[in-house]
Amino acid sequence: MSATIRTGLLGGSFNPAHGGHRRISLFALQALRLDEVWWLVSPGNPLKSADGMASHEARYRSALEQARRAPIRVTAIEAQLGTRYTVDTLRTLRGRYPRREFVWLMGADNLATFHRWKAWRDIARTMPIAVVARPGYDKDAIASPAMAWLRGHRTSAAEFRSRGRWSAPTLVTLRFDPDSRSATAIRRADPDWPSRYRSGLLFDQVTHRSIFGEREPPA
């Protein structure tokens, strides 16, 4: 890795994680020349209903399964920090990991509703944003209030890669074959998917803290 570790952040419910998340992450790694990607498995989304939401542990374990043998780290750091909103999480990460340069990864569906996020302009000022195409959402994303504000800060992936230091606000649009897989379709086809994952102690891949279980007391 370089002296500055370039890290993509992909946040979401991961309800469940699936191959589409992995494919987007691997594409961003190559297109932006990232060192690694962190998956921020959210304890809850203020803009989404809790109906049908699996436990945080089941969603985290599904993400671990999808991230195997790839430069992807799965983290529950939002739950550990106690942050509820993305803007607070990203500010904290920047302060906690000064040797890293972060870029926020999101699908076009998120950009279409980005103006509804708390302090969305502050998010854009905190770190660069890379938007990945998603089937059926490109038109809404292009017409969104957030795009109107960010349009003057757009740059190509090639120019972004070549920058010595990243700055914000910056918007990079990544184009590749859209992946049609969705967590909604997976839940519909297999509503009992969380039952595949057994409960127990895990260690967070970013903070290395124990999560989702009690440490056994020393003998």
Curated annotation (Swiss-Prot):
Enumerate the Gene3D superfamilies for this protein.
HUPs
Chain coiled-coil ranges = none
Q: What does the record give as the reaction this protein catalyses? A: nicotinate beta-D-ribonucleotide + ATP + H(+) = deamido-NAD(+) + diphosphate
Primary role = Catalyzes the reversible adenylation of nicotinate mononucleotide (NaMN) to nicotinic acid adenine dinucleotide (NaAD).
The family database entries (NCBIfam families) matched by this protein are listed as: PRK00071.2-2 (NF000843)
The record's HAMAP family line, in alphabetical order, gives:
NaMN_adenylyltr
Identification of the protein by name: Probable nicotinate-nucleotide adenylyltransferase
What's the source species for this entry?
Erythrobacter litoralis (strain HTCC2594)
In the record, what lineage is assigned to the organism producing the protein? Bacteria, Pseudomonadati, Pseudomonadota, Alphaproteobacteria, Sphingomonadales
